[in-house]
Amino acid sequence: MSNILKIFVDGLWKKNSSLVQLLGLCPVLAITVNAINAIGLGLATTLVLICSNATISLIKNNIQKDFRIPIYIIIISSVVSSIDLVIKAYAFNLYQSLGIFIPLIITNCIVCNRADLIAVHNSVLVSILDGLSIGLGSTLTMFLLGSIREIIGHGTLFFGIEHVLGESFRFLYIEVLDKNSVFLLFAFPSGAFMILGIVLAGKNFLDEVLGIIEHKNVCVCSNKVLVYKDGNKKIESQKSL
């Protein structure tokens, strides 16, 4: 398996930031009320990951280890602010829906994690591909949760798509369920927790069936991997790509 394919398989499935590492769950649970909001925040997060990873990789030789976290935050803040202004200018309705969750991308631990784990140790190309794969993995997770919650909680799919992609895409809007058949619980955060739990269980079941599950815990803070072999715990350093 080539390195590029491995990066995307890890980002989309094996090391999905939302379903495996369980990072950045606050926006995942809060903003996935419908599919369009989920796609909007997911793509914004993906752009932040790509741009911040590329920038940090370009200047990695000039970043002192003791000051790396403040530098990451400054770079990520600049990227998020730029994307926030673009969304406000060209997709104002989406901007109003996402609200505070766009600026909160700055504090999203997924972004800082990839910067410190990948971007500062690898080439620009690898850093960009890593940001793209991790971002798409998070976007797909949010889209799945948002679609399920919108269908069950509101009986629709792609509500408000014309505000993001234009009137020509209004035909994608679907009324799946009658308004009297919806289950409003899933439109609230408690429903988001329930759906996330079901999705996590489904992914773990598929991993077991396909035989691709890895019984190991990754410590994001120390970049260590705890590998369990024959009941014994062995600590190994995680290698960069």
UniProtKB/Swiss-Prot annotation:
Its main location: membrane. One of its GO terms (cellular component) is plasma membrane. It is found in: Cell inner membrane. Keywords: Cell inner membrane, Cell membrane, Electron transport, Membrane, Translocase, Transmembrane, Transmembrane helix, Transport. GO terms for biological process: electron transport chain. It is a multi-pass membrane protein. It is an enzyme of class 7 (translocase). Its EC number is 7.-.-.-. Part of a membrane-bound complex that couples electron transfer with translocation of ions across the membrane. PANTHER family: ELECTRON TRANSPORT COMPLEX PROTEIN RNFE, ION-TRANSLOCATING OXIDOREDUCTASE COMPLEX SUBUNIT E. Belongs to the NqrDE/RnfAE family. This is Ion-translocating oxidoreductase complex subunit E. It comes from Buchnera aphidicola subsp. Baizongia pistaciae (strain Bp).
